[in-house]
Amino acid sequence: MAMPFEIEVLLPGELSPAETSALQKCEGKIITFSTLRHRASLVDIALSSYYINGAPPDTLSLLEAYRMRFAAVITRVIPGKLLAHAIGVGTPTPGLFIQNTSPVDLCNGDYICLLPPVFGSADSIRLDSVGLEIVFPLTIPQTLMREIIAKVVARAVERTAAGAQILPHEVLRGADVICYNGRRYELETNLQHRDGSDAAIRTLVLNLMFSINEGCLLLLALIPTLLVQGAHDGYVNLLIQTANCVRETGQLINIPPMPRIQDGHRRFPIYETISSWISTSSRLGDTLGTRAILRVCVFDGPSTVHPGDRTAVIQV
């Protein structure tokens, strides 16, 4: 009979009573493992396990690690060991709960993603007796995750441009701000490693070039139809008025008219272009962002989970 995948994290005997008590308060928080084993050590979940060539990770490095590593929820801390259940491996754990480690509220039904600390101080615990530190990922709603990822990648592009003297250092923007559920939050991203920034920018530029190419050809093919419908449809008329730059640029390009029949044998059939464009946008989100691993599922009690509170979840 299939069972939940339980992991035993062995705790060193050098831990002080205060550190053991602090670990017990971490029940419900999420940790990640580079490999799945039924028995692991405390070093496997410490911040040092994320180091790259001996250097501490930055925001993009942690984000990439969360995409590649296996997540698990701390279910119990007993003398000598820490018990955790892996997410997405084995049968779902009945009665699973997590602790909201983000500064934003979680609502019933929210899909939860893992993000690095981007709101200033990290949710972490220091174990000075063994020289280790554990940094817990943030439990962020998927809807908010998309906006945060966009701002982090945009900030990485800005830092890279400034470092390459493409953009003067004096014109760097201030801190990024997001609003969620009527509250204002300030993002503090840590971007130190060029590898993570370069990989994100390379992915962004490649997808951007492909999307612009497909989108311009699609728009040029649809302009005659939009011009005809603009006199009758207010939405289409507004769309045409807001696309003056693209239309003026398109007038400089002499592209032969495309046949109306879509038989799939030409390079840029309209509906195939639409499908390819949508698929590209989806892949870009999957490449830069992170997937949801849990969903808030509250049957009784308040539907809003405040920071630091615990809530029941189901695996997705």
Swiss-Prot record:
Keywords: Capsid protein, Host nucleus, Virion. InterPro entries: Herpes_capsid_2. It is found in: Virion; Host nucleus. One of its GO terms (cellular component) is host cell nucleus. The keyword Plastid does not apply. GO terms for molecular function: structural molecule activity. It comes from the Viruses. Coiled coil: none annotated. HAMAP family: HSV_TRX2 (MF_04019). Interacts with TRX1 and major capisd protein/MCP. Structural component of the T=16 icosahedral capsid. The capsid is composed of pentamers and hexamers of major capsid protein/MCP, which are linked together by heterotrimers called triplexes. These triplexes are formed by a single molecule of triplex protein 1/TRX1 and two copies of triplex protein 2/TRX2. Additionally, TRX1 is required for efficient transport of TRX2 to the nucleus, which is the site of capsid assembly. Belongs to the herpesviridae TRX2 protein family. This is Triplex capsid protein 2. It comes from Varicella-zoster virus (strain Dumas) (HHV-3).
